[in-house]
Amino acid sequence: MDAPIKAPTALNTEKARALAVALAQIEKQFGKGTIMKLGAGEVIEDIQVVSTGSLGLDIALGVGGLPRGRVVEIYGPESSGKTTLTLQVIAEMQKIGGTCAFVDAEHALDIQYAQKLGVNLQELLISQPDTGEQALEIVDSLTRSGAVDLIVIDSVAALTPKAELEGEMGDSLPGLQARLMSQALRKLTATIKKANCMVIFINQIRMKIGVMFGSPETTTGGNALKFYASVRLDIRRIGSIKKGDEVIGNETRVKVVKNKVASPFKMAEFDILYGEGISRLGEVLDLGVANHVVEKAGAWYAYRGEKIGQGRDNSREFLKENPALAIEIENKVREALGIPLVQAAQGSAEPEKAAKPEKVEKADKPVKAVVDKTLAAPLAPVAS
């Protein structure tokens, strides 16, 4: 049986007065808004997010993308797609008018590849610092300006402390990088939140020696980043995509290892095509089949009873030639999953009027549809 609710007593009144005095003193010393009741004042806004460029990963993150004003860590083995994923995030941020910076500590950014992924090089800020301290000071200055929306650091392993650079080869300097990262993150976290700036750290994997139980894998830079990161993504290459004997891309799996804004431990799989980046249309097909928006019978894919292609590659090419139809299918998938819809590009037809495959009586040839020139506009960015 629940205990009866007690009426306010003199003791409770005294506690309320003492609390009011303490709050007034704190606001006088540190400024208005330093402390307040969570239900008072302004309405708490929903988490602002930026798409990753992958529909499946946006869904796995639970909020439709990566959160702004937070620290994010993306780690994985070599050539697993870490830099590609961050460049896609930069492209998505630029589509909604955000200012982005890339701190290239590895001195290995391929600007031609970045451009192919949709990055606007004219608007991208880039820095190639000499030391780890210099790199993190640059990040601190950019976040304090309040004018930058996204900063990518590639990578934590390349943030070499100045003392290590000035020392001799073979010098033992334990813990220098870990202390550097710990100090920097203590300093940066509050500023990142106030500036609503997302900071993405790319990290590498190392093997711990003598581990008998559990995974021997660990990330560089100590434990501070593990604690301060709101989202941690583990990205792995799980296979190759071939066209004949030629390898044209990687099958990639991303696991949400840590997530402070939604449920963790979800996974997403997508294709990364060389020279193109994440195959969004391939994801639309796969998620369409999984959510019963697209029908699949044998090798044939169909939408609303109309065949759109034989085989995944042919169907993906058909959607590439018919962007309005691709938007329509993607919105059906988004509607089924309960996430915000994507808007059609200006100058394109409405999704309901999108070009549809012609009906065929015989299924011996791929369907060819006549597409109006006005439907050739690219897919619109995902609304964050």
UniProtKB/Swiss-Prot annotation:
The UniProt record lists the keyword DNA damage: yes
Compositional bias annotation for Basic and acidic residues: 350-365
Keyword set includes DNA damage: yes
Domain of life: Bacteria
Gene Ontology, cellular component aspect: cytosol
One biological process term in Gene Ontology: DNA recombination
Cellular location(s): Cytoplasm
Binding site for ATP: 76-83
One Gene Ontology molecular-function label: ATP hydrolysis activity
Keywords on record: ATP-binding, Cytoplasm, DNA damage, DNA recombination, DNA repair, DNA-binding, Nucleotide-binding, SOS response
UniProt-annotated stretches for the region Disordered: 346-365
Main function: Can catalyze the hydrolysis of ATP in the presence of single-stranded DNA, the ATP-dependent uptake of single-stranded DNA by duplex DNA, and the ATP-dependent hybridization of homologous single-stranded DNAs. It interacts with LexA causing its activation and leading to its autocatalytic cleavage.
UniProt record similarity statement: Belongs to the RecA family.
Protein name: Protein RecA
Gene name of the record: recA
